[in-house]
Amino acid sequence: SPDDPAYQAFYRGAQTERDRAYHQGTVWPWLLGLYADAVAAVEGPDAAKEEMMPVLAALSAHLRTEGCIGQIGEVFDGDAPHRPGGAPAQAWSVSEVLRVAKMASP
């Protein structure tokens, strides 16, 4: 949480700084699938689709134009502009984003 004193908004710097940010501020794209499942279970599939669309649009643009084209990075900064970090191509990030996109499609 950004309110936690240990929160690290950006994944950068020396190894020790990146290690702190790894579990104290970065966004892990593969968790989007679990979050979408939870929203669908609690609020219903339509609510999950509505909530996922802006996130899917941003990740789709990243997939097509940034970093390793056709891939999604391992982590993203917790604060805007949410730059990718870690491994430039993470299979489980791509697979969960594609699964959520399929869930959100009409």
Residue spans for each PLM region:
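Structural helix-adjacent loops and short alpha-helical linkers that scaffold large soluble proteins
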Residues: 39-54, 102-106
